[in-house]
Amino acid sequence: MLRLDLQFFASKKGVGSTKNGRDSIAKRLGAKRADGQFVTGGSILYRQRGTKIYPGLNVGRGGDDTLYAKVDGIVRFERMGRDRKKVSVYPVVKEA
């Protein structure tokens, strides 16, 4: 009688999809104007999530916490105490 020697080797059968392999798009947060720079009213100064930087003089805060200039002037990033920062816009005085 013939003996048949069958051997089955380990093999990878089904290939599932991976759960990684995706990345979210960047939100472009951060400073949009530098300290000492001249800005016009309505210019965006800082895009943020939450209040990393607080609005100072002549600066408004939008619904998504974006800081914007209310008047034309010079941008100043300042400290409020030890651990808080604020951004202000100081109007330029025109000489006649």
UniProtKB/Swiss-Prot annotation:
Free-text description of this protein's post-translational modifications in UniProt: The N-terminus is cleaved by ribosomal processing cysteine protease Prp.
Protein name: Large ribosomal subunit protein bL27
UniProt keyword Cell cycle present: no
Protein family per UniProt: Belongs to the bacterial ribosomal protein bL27 family.
InterPro entries listed in its UniProt record: Ribosomal_bL27, Ribosomal_bL27_CS
Propeptide residue range(s): 1-9
GO process annotations (BP): translation
